């Protein structure tokens, strides 16, 4: 099924991939992205662990409806979370792209 040394090579590749993924996860945790709503009037900065680092609100919104401002903050946070998820997927895909796996084989991590 795996050929001579195939299983050993596969295990070695899995170990290397796991190390790369650990490093990538550490890098992702350090990333920061900015989500926006209201055409940039509300900005939320989060890190790769989805922790909110900063919320910026344009002063013109402070005079408006409280409910609208709350909605804009939530929308900006959701935009930032979506951006972090996209970045994580791109970075993780780059880690696993070089690995030669048998058809149908799925990694546990």
From Swiss-Prot:
The keyword Cytoplasm applies. This is Nucleoid-associated protein YbaB. Disulfide bonds: none annotated. GO terms for molecular function: DNA binding. Binds to DNA and alters its conformation. May be involved in regulation of gene expression, nucleoid organization and DNA protection. InterPro entries: YbaB-like_sf, YbaB/EbfC. Keywords: Cytoplasm, DNA-binding. Belongs to the YbaB/EbfC family. The keyword Metal-binding does not apply. Residues 88-109 are annotated as: Disordered. It comes from the Bacteria. Signal peptide: none annotated. GO terms for cellular component: bacterial nucleoid; cytosol. Its main location: cytoplasm. It is found in: Cytoplasm, Nucleoid. Homodimer. It comes from Escherichia coli O139:H28 (strain E24377A / ETEC).
């Amino acid at each position: 099924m795996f050929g001579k040394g195939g299983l050993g090579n596969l295990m070695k590749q899995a170990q290397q991939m796991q190390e790369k993924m650990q490093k990538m996860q550490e890098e992702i945790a350090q990333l920061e992205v900015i989500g926006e709503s209201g055409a940039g009037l509300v900005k939320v900065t989060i890190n790769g662990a989805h922790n909110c680092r900063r919320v910026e609100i344009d002063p013109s919104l402070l005079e408006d409806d409280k409910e609208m401002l709350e909605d804009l903050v939530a929308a900006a946070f959701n935009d930032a979370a979506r951006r972090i998820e996209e970045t994580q997927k791109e970075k993780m895909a780059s880690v696993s792209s070089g690995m030669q796996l048998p058809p149908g084989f799925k990694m546990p991590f």
